[in-house]
Amino acid sequence: LIAAAHLGHDGVVKQLIAAGAPLDHVNNLHWTAMIESIVLGNGGARHQEVLRALIAARANTQLTDRMGTTPLALARSRGYDVMVAMLEKAGAK
C-alpha cells in the first residue's frame, strides 16, 4: 500500500484497501501510506485520489513522521492546498 501510495497508483491503492491492507502500517522511515502520498507525491490529481481513498477508508490522519510532523503539516509545507482541504475536512490537526 505504501509503495502504491507514493507512486500515485490510486487504482492499486483502492484494490489494496478493499483487500484489507493495513492502512496505518509504519515503514522504517516512520512513514505511512498517507504520509508517502504527500511527501513523495506531487500534490496532483492521482496523489489527491490516493489521499481521498485513504481518508475514506478511515486511515489515521494524526500519525506523524519521525519528526512528529502530521500529514496536514506536511501538505501545508508543500503548498498542496487541495490535500490540506481534504485533511482538514477529515478532522486532521
Predicted regions span which residues?
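Terminal, low-structured helical/coil segments at or just beyond the last alpha-helical repeat
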Residues: 66, 74-93
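Alpha-solenoid repeat scaffolds
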Residues: 23, 44-47, 61, 82
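Ankyrin repeat domain, specifically the short helix-to-loop turn at the C-terminus of the second helix
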Residues: 14-22, 52-60, 86-92
